[in-house]
């Protein structure tokens, strides 16, 4: 694919790296870290947040460490994937189960969070509550203590309302992926945009959003709270960048989406002169 030509530096806050196979995994094919790096370069992406894909049961410690190793000497920022014992559902039965939920050995503990936070290979956390469960209160307390950003899969299995109830009372930055509406749920995406009015530490990433009117509304109403996410490898970075480049928004707002807002969230993880 041809390289995109544009005048923006792009930071991508959403790319998946398969730890077990040594490559990035999408349905039916695997892409190596080198190929992911090339595709990011083609799209003008200068830094990419990467995290391991899901696994059935078990701890994410080895997968996180593998992603961190494969990020060395590449323009990747490793996020540690975390899990927990609590059911993210909004029904009364879920709340009842959570009263008796206890952390097991394979769940992320406060000690794990502390270790990740003070390992300079990791720059934040990835959480998919619908697949991996929610951390318990002690682990959330430690996430709040370390203060690193948490990228949260948002959608039909974990709605913006559920994210607000479970996470947004905390002080750490929350980046709600997919505008909180995966897969392509306009109503949930609209709820997530409205959520920004009430929660100063909440941000949205653009991965898999596709709806131009919702993207433009969020960028125009909340220009400091929208971050670019490619969703690679399921979406090619070129395609994801073009979706933002073609929005009818001011250039300064576009620059915030591509670069400046990520700097606010990632802080010292991004060098000032890259």
Where are these regions (language model features)?
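Divalent metal-dependent hydrolysis catalytic cores, especially in the metallo-beta-lactamase
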Residues: 15-16, 27, 34-58, 76-83, ...
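Active-site gating/metal-coordination segments in enzymes
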Residues: 61-151
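Catalytic pocket-lining loop regions of alpha/beta-barrel enzymes
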Residues: 132-228
